Amino acid sequence: MGTTSSQSKTLYQKLYDAHIVHEAPNETPLLYIDRHLVHEVTSPQAFDGLRAMGRPVRQPGKTFATMDHNVSTQTKDINASGEMARIQMQELIKNCAEFGVSLYDLNHPFQGIVHVIGPEQGMTLPGMTIVCGDSHTATHGAFGSLAFGIGTSEVEHVLATQTLKQGRAKTMRIEVNGTVGAGITAKDIVLAIIGKTGSAGGTGHVVEFCGSAIEALSMEGRMTLCNMAIEMGAKAGLVAPDDTTFAYLKGRQFAPTGEQWEQGVAYWRTLKSDADAQFDTIVTLDAADIAPQVTWGTNPGQVIAVNQIIPAPESFSDPVERASAEKALAYMDLRPGIKLTEVAIDKVFIGSCTNSRIEDLRAAAAIAQGRKVAKGVQAIVVPGSGPVKAQAEAEGLDKIFIAAGFEWRLPGCSMCLAMNNDRLEPGERCASTSNRNFEGRQGRGGRTHLVSPAMAAAAAVSGHFADVRELSATTH
């Protein structure tokens, strides 16, 4: 290797190195944190810790809060999701007022899921470090920012010092080349990736997604991709910023303006992996091979194309995978050898920080239009934020959903996780656009299948999983 190669860096290494505040021998480096996003579930103990030590929030202007995990999606009443939820939301209101942190509370027009509102308001910018007490913070990596989830004690540390100890991760490049077929979305791409790597394939790595199929994605598609980097075990996901990124950000509330914007873009254009940068792991996929994906098991790596058969445990050579498949099939009440298109569903959830943005809702509405939700199926659509809801209503998407028999709800995390009133009953089967199909994730005993918004809408109107490509081809 020549001298140039030893100097060349991946995008992750550039972001990491630019934020080192202090690095002592044999110590984990201390990184500066540019943005800290806060929600009601992982912050109360952190603020209590500051109060006990008499510390202020060091940079209230770099800290933004909202309530999302346990809000009701049917009313703006703070009491609607039960006592624990009410206490957490009231604590957040009190803490933000006391410590001078801006809060998008239940009645704020911009309230919504933290990972939807950050990018939407331009709080998320390329080149930043971004943390939140939430595992899906990786979403913001779509902008070429180093974004990851942290625990509650770390939330307190960032509030107090605006820094965090963070070791270097390994690097992984996932390249998706070519063009996807009709009806294939970012959700299908990322589920296909996790199907290939497995749910632990990215452990210890920061993943950079690249290739022509990734460059062709909108910012919302890239957010879906990075949102689920965590589901392959990765620390964070990244997409290098480009003209698509800059066009999305220009004019947003917290985006720079004028000369600062020009300077920002000039710097952001340098945020890409050098041509000869070395990655620890490289994974490649051909976009043309990707079909609509549906998970069959209890981790996102247990996934197949909608037209494939559910695998038999014996088909796995690894004994751990075989045992995991056996357990998953029993929990999910599925038989190997059949197709998921033969499997009936009870509920459909379109929403979450993975798939609740305007393009997601448009894709679902295109399938719902002129059709009806199947008898016996409850289908809910939960926009990711106030602005997404307002835009969808301006475009008449709410009317399409309501006419088809879907419920049109208020913004929040909703049925992605059983922390509010939207949940599965034991044994209920759900086609969900969220990111985790773990046992009990959507409610104790609930069975979750992860799909794209269009696939979720197709399941809702069919009463079972269906290949969206066949529905798209038929007239209503």
From Swiss-Prot:
Residues involved in [4Fe-4S] cluster binding: 353, 413, 416
Source organism superkingdom: Bacteria
Keywords: 4Fe-4S, Amino-acid biosynthesis, Branched-chain amino acid biosynthesis, Iron, Iron-sulfur, Leucine biosynthesis, Lyase, Metal-binding
Cofactors named for this entry: [4Fe-4S] cluster
Signal sequence annotation: none
Catalysed reactions, as listed in the record: (2R,3S)-3-isopropylmalate = (2S)-2-isopropylmalate
GO molecular function list: 3-isopropylmalate dehydratase activity; 4 iron, 4 sulfur cluster binding; metal ion binding
Pathway connected to this protein: Amino-acid biosynthesis; L-leucine biosynthesis; L-leucine from 3-methyl-2-oxobutanoate: step 2/4
EC number assigned by the record: 4.2.1.33
Stored CDD domains: IPMI
Pfam family, one: Aconitase
Disulfide bridge positions per record: none
SUPFAM superfamilies assigned to the protein according to its UniProt record, in alphabetical order: Aconitase iron-sulfur domain
Entry function: Catalyzes the isomerization between 2-isopropylmalate and 3-isopropylmalate, via the formation of 2-isopropylmaleate.
Self-association state and partner proteins as the record states: Heterodimer of LeuC and LeuD.
Protein name listed in UniProt: 3-isopropylmalate dehydratase large subunit
The organism of origin for this protein: Yersinia pestis
Protein encoded by which gene: leuC
